[in-house]
């Protein structure tokens, strides 16, 4: 197992799933902190943009003064569900992009409403066994740029991608006991 004890990982905690991400990060040995301010953001080696409601998160990023700092944040980022939407540089339906850090286009709520949430075994590039992916009002990536690597698809739709030190997934890895997605994210710190 890798040693992540020297790293501090932030989880943006303006809205959305935070404690589950913190627990998984700490399980792997890294220090995890909730990020609500610029001073907290400046302490981290990498950042998780959690699930939640992307439009509400954008408003809170602006009101907290974090929006511009997040746009210029150049360390590794893992965006899950709404976090994927925040990372996209294009959203279907004409909605303006949020942080626009990844060359991807995203369809929001692509798999239906809350009642249509599901878990499936997902094959992820580089993983020997399937991953128990939990989809809750999940988006998917409808278009990718040439610099984006597809890590997983479900029913022909891209649901996990990588661009440089950015990872974006449509599902919630923090809602399972399987830590491989978070470990893949933490490995970005060693590259």
From Swiss-Prot:
Signal peptide: none annotated. This is Pyridoxal 5'-phosphate synthase subunit PdxT. Keywords: Glutamine amidotransferase, Hydrolase, Lyase, Pyridoxal phosphate. The active site is at 81 (nucleophile), 172 (charge relay system), 174 (charge relay system). InterPro entries: Class_I_gatase-like (IPR029062), PdxT/SNO (IPR002161), PdxT/SNO_CS (IPR021196). In the presence of PdxS, forms a dodecamer of heterodimers. Only shows activity in the heterodimer. L-glutamine binds at residues 52-54, 108, 136-137. Pathway: Cofactor biosynthesis; pyridoxal 5'-phosphate biosynthesis. Belongs to the glutaminase PdxT/SNO family. GO terms for biological process: glutamine catabolic process; pyridoxal phosphate biosynthetic process; pyridoxine metabolic process. GO terms for cellular component: cytosol; glutaminase complex. It comes from Actinobacillus pleuropneumoniae serotype 5b (strain L20). One of its GO terms (molecular function) is glutaminase activity. It catalyses: aldehydo-D-ribose 5-phosphate + D-glyceraldehyde 3-phosphate + L-glutamine = pyridoxal 5'-phosphate + L-glutamate + phosphate + 3 H2O + H(+); L-glutamine + H2O = L-glutamate + NH4(+).
């Amino acid at each position: 197992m890798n040693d992540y004890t020297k790293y501090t990982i932030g989880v943006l905690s303006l809205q959305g799933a935070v404690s589950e991400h913190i627990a998984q990060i700490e399980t792997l040995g890294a220090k995890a902190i909730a990020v609500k301010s610029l001073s907290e953001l400046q302490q981290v080696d990498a950042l998780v943009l959690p699930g939640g409601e992307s439009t509400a998160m954008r408003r809170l990023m602006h009101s907290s003064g974090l929006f511009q700092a997040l746009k210029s944040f150049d360390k590794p980022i893992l965006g899950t569900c709404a976090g994927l939407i925040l990372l996209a540089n294009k959203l279907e339906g004409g909605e303006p992009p949020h942080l626009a850090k990844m060359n991807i286009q995203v369809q929001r709520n692509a798999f239906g409403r809350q009642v249509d949430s599901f878990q499936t075994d997902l094959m992820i590039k580089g993983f020997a066994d399937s991953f128990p992916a939990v989809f809750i009002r999940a988006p998917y990536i409808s278009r990718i740029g040439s610099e984006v690597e597809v890590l997983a698809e479900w029913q022909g739709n891209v649901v996990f991608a990588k661009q440089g030190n950015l990872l974006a997934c449509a599902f919630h890895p923090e809602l399972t006991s399987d830590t491989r997605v978070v470990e893949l994210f933490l490995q970005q710190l060693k590259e």
